[in-house]
Amino acid sequence: MESHSSLSSSSSSSPPSSLSSESCCVKVAVNVRPLIGDEVTQGCRECVSVSPVTPQVQMGTHPFTFDHVYGSNGSPSSLMFEECVAPLVDGLFHGYNATVLAYGQTGSGKTYTMGTGIKDGTKNGLIPQVMSALFNKIDSVKHQMGFQLHVSFIEILKEEVLDLLDSSVPFNRLANGTPGKVVLSKSPVQIRESPNGVITLSGATEVPIATKEEMASCLEQGSLTRATGSTNMNNESSRSHAIFTITLEQMRKISSISVVKDTVDEDMGEEYCCAKLHLVDLAGSERAKRTGSGGVRLKEGIHINRGLLALGNVISALGDEKRRKEGAHVPYRDSKLTRLLQDSLGGNSKTVMIACISPADINAEETLNTLKYANRARNIQNKPVANKDLICSEMQKMRQELQYLQATLCARGATSSEEVQVMREKIMKLESANEELSRELHIYRSKRVTLDYCNIDAQEDGVIFSKDDGLKRGFESMDSDYEMSEATSGGISEDIGAAEEWEHALRQNSMGKELNELSKRLEEKESEMRVCGIGTETIRQHFEKKMMELEKEKRTVQDERDMLLAEVEELAASSDRQAQVARDNHAHKLKALETQILNLKKKQENQVEVLKQKQKSEDAAKRLKTEIQCIKAQKVQLQQKMKQEAEQFRQWKASQEKELLQLKKEGRKTEHERLKLEALNRRQKMVLQRKTEEAAMATKRLKELLEARKSSPHDISVIANGQPPSRQTNEKSLRKWLDNELEVMAKVHQVRFQYEKQIQVRAALAVELTSLRQEMEFPSNSHQEKNGQFRFLSPNTRLERIASLESMLDVSSNALTAMGSQLSEAEEREHSLHAKPRWNHIQSMTDAKYLLQYVFDSTAEARSKIWEKDRDIKEKKEQLNDLLCLLQLTEVQNREILKEKKTREQTVSIALASTSSSYSGSSRSSSKHYGDNNASDDPSSPSSTYHRATKHLKYTGPGIVNISVRESEALLEETRKMKAMKKMGQSGKLWKWKRSHHQWLLQFKWKWQKPWKLSEWIKQNDETTMHVMSKSHHDDEDDHSWNRHSMFQGA
C-alpha cells in the first residue's frame, strides 16, 4: 500500500474535467443472503423486507434507503459488479483511487461476496470479476499506453498487520499445536505516514503482475495463508481483516502538432498516473455466547469487535454533518484498521460499502446494527482526485499555449485584405476565360475524333478526303484562333495547353480501351454464333438418322405381318374337311361321357346324404356326453367354491372384527393422544403468551429507562456546570442517576435472557413442526421411527397442530424482532456512552466518595438479600424433600392396597376351584390330595393358588389361625351347597379352565348347558367370603397403619 512519492493531488496542473476535486458520497449497497439450513431447521423467519421498486429495506418500524439492494426481493446479486464495482475499475485508468468495503456480522456472506476465499480456481466473488475486467481493459488500450501492475495482500490479526504474500511464512503453520497462532519468520508490517499525508506500509510485499493467472495465484496464496477458524455460526469464520490492493501505473504518449511557416513540428511527451484499488474483506462482528468461542477464538473475537467498534466510531464521526462542519476530531488512530482506511473514508478515494446482512430473525439485533452503520456511511463525503504527475501536466499545458501562439503569429504575418481581394478577382476572371476556351476545344476535338472513326469505316468513298481536308482546315483555323487566344491569356496559356494535351491523351486511351472491349465482345458473339451453327447441324443429322431407322423398322414389321397372314390362310384352306370329321366323332363321345357323369353324380349325392345323417347322430351323442361331463365338473366346482366362499367369509368376518377391535383400540389411543396434544398446545400457548408478555414488559421498561437516561446525564451536567447546588440535592441526583444506570443494565440483561429463552422456545417449536411435516410427507418412514409420537394422530389433528405451531412461531418471531431492535438501541447508546466517558460529570472527590459509599451499601444490601433468598431456597428444598418422602410412603401404601386386592381376587379363584372339584364328583380328601399334588407341578393352577392363599392367610400374623379355620369351614360348607346343586339337571359339564387378564373363569362345553347360572353361584360365594374376611381385613389395616407410622418416624 506504499504510494509513489512523485504523485500529487493538485488540480491546477490538470484539465478541469479530469482532475477537479469534487466531493462525492460513499455509495452503499446491501446484500441480503438467503436463509441457510441451520436457520431453517431452527424455524427462523425473515425479519427484513425489501421493496421491489425502490432500493429500500424495512426492518420492523425502521426503514432504510440505500443506493442498491441485492437479494430477497431486490436486484439479483449478479448485477452487483456491473452497478457498483465496474465504474471504480474504469476510474482506475483515469487515476482515481477506489475502495470496496464488505461489512457485516459473522456468517453474513462477506468473504463469499468479495471472493477472498477463492480456492481451486473458482470464479465466485467480486475480486475475480475485477481481475477479468481489469485485464480486458488493459488489452483494449495497451497500444496507446504502457501499464505496470502490482498487488499486495495483508491481514490485520489481533491488531497486528501481517503480510499474506510473504513466501517465508509457511501455509497453515501452527505453534505448539494451538490453532490460530501463525509462527512469523519476521517482524510484522509497520504503518507509516509520508510527509504529504499518504499512509504507507513498511515491509509489505508488492508482487509485479503480468497476467490474470498470476494475480489469481497471489489471491489464492493469500487466502490459504489467512487465519480462519470454526465457530458455532460458521465453519470457516475469518479471524482477521483482509485487504487486497491492486496498484495500476500507466504511461500515456502525448503528441502536440504546431505549424510555423508551412512546416510541421510534432513533439512527443509522456503522461504518468498511478491509482490503487483496495478490496477489503472485514471480519464479522460476533457474540461469544452465539459463536461458542473460548480461549484463542475468544481473544480473536475481542480484537475483531474492538476494531469494528473503532470503525463504527469513525463512520459516526464522518457521517454526522454537524460534527463535520464543526471540524470535530475523527478517531482514525484508535485502530490499525481505521488507520489503513483513512483515505477510503473521507479522503482521496471513491468508496463503495457493501453491507452483508442475514434476514433471519435470530440475527435481528446484529442486522439492525449493520443497517444503521451502513445508513450513516452514506453521509460520508470523500474528495477523490486524479493522481497524475505534475511535470507531465505542466508540459501538456505549455504545449497547448505554444499551439495557440503559433496560430496567432500566422494570422498576424499575412498581407492586407484589399490586395488579397484584387488578386482573387483577377484570378477568377482568368479562370473563367480559361474554362470557356477549354469547353470549346473539347467540343471540336470530340467532333474530330468522331470523324476519324467515320474515316476508318468509309475509306472506299472518295468524299472522305474532301471532308477531311475541310475539317482539317477548320481545325487549323480553330487552332489558330486558339493560339491567338492563348497569346492574349499570357502565362496561363501554357498551363492550359499542357492540361489539354493531358486530357487528350487520357481520352485517346479511354476510347482505345472501349474499342478493344467492343472488338472482344464482337469476337465472342461470332464464336458463339459459330458454335450455335455447329450444334444445330449435329442435331439435325441425328434426327434424320433416327427417322431412317424408324422407317426401316416399320417396313420390317409390315413384311412380317404379311407373311403371317399368308400362312394363316394356307393353314385354313388345307384342314377344313379333316377337322369336320374329327369334330363329329368327338361330339358323340362327349355326349356319352356326359350321360355317365350325370348318373354317377346322382349316386354320389345319395351316398353323401346317408353319411351326413350318420355323422349327425354320432355328433349328437358325443355332444350329450360332453355336456354331462361338464355339468358334473361344474357341480363339483360349485360345491368347492361354496365351501371356499364360506371359509373366506368366515375369515373375512373374523378379520373385520379383529380390525374393528384394533381400530377401536387405535381410536382410543388417538383420542388420548389428541387430548394430550390439546393440553400440550394449551400449555405451550400459555407459556409462550406468558413469556411474550414478560418480554414485552421488559422491553417496554427498557425503552422507558433508555428514554429517561437521555435526560439524566443532561440534568446532572447542568447541576455540575451551573451554580453549586445543595449537598442533599446533589447526592439525591447522583443516587437517582446511578440507580437508573444500574436498572438499565439489569433490564438489558433481563431482555437478553428473555431473548435467548425465546430463541430456545422457537427452536423447539420448529423441530416439532419439522417432524410433523416429515410425517405428513413420508408416513411410511415415520411409522418405523422409534420416536414417532404423532403417528397415531389423524390427518386433521396433525393439520390443526401444524397451524397452531405456525401461529406460535409467528408470535415468537415478532417478539424476537422487537427485542432485537430494543437490544440494538441499548447497545448503540451504550457505545455512545463509551465514546463519551460515563463519569465525566463527576466534578469532585466528594461526589466520587459518596457514589462509592452508595455502591458499597447497595452491594452489601444486595448480598444480604441474596443470602436470605438462598436460605429460603434451602428451606423450600427441605420441605420439598419431606413432601417427596410422603409421596413415596403413599406409593408404598398404594402398592400394599393393590396386593390386598389381588389377594381377594385369588380367594375368589380359590372358591371357583373348590366349586369345580365338587362338580367333578371327587370327595373332600381327594380334592385336597389333588390340590396338594398339582401345586408343585403347576404353580399357575387354581389349586396351587388356593394352597398358597390358604397358607398366606394362615401365617400372616398371630391370632389368625382360628380365622383361617373358620374360613376353610365356610368354604367347605359352600362346596357342599354347590354339590347339592349339582344334583339338579340344569348344571353343565366343566370343560376347561381359561386364564384371561389374571383371573380364572369357567367355560362350558355346550351352549345348552346354560352357563348364566354360574354368575349366581359366584355371587353367593363372594358374599360369604367377604363376610368371613372382613375382620381379617380390619386387622391387616391396623398392622399396616402401625408399620407406616414407624416408617415415617424413621424417616
From Swiss-Prot:
Disruption phenotype: No visible phenotype. It comes from the Eukaryota. GO terms for cellular component: microtubule. InterPro entries: Kinesin-like_fam, Kinesin_motor_CS, Kinesin_motor_dom, Kinesin_motor_dom_sf, P-loop_NTPase. The gene is KIN4B. Belongs to the TRAFAC class myosin-kinesin ATPase superfamily. Kinesin family. KIN-4 subfamily. GO terms for molecular function: ATP binding; microtubule binding; microtubule motor activity. This is Kinesin-like protein KIN-4B. Composed of an N-terminal domain which is responsible for the motor activity of kinesin (it hydrolyzes ATP and binds microtubule) and a central to C-terminal alpha-helical coiled coil domain that mediates the heavy chain dimerization. The keyword ATP-binding applies.
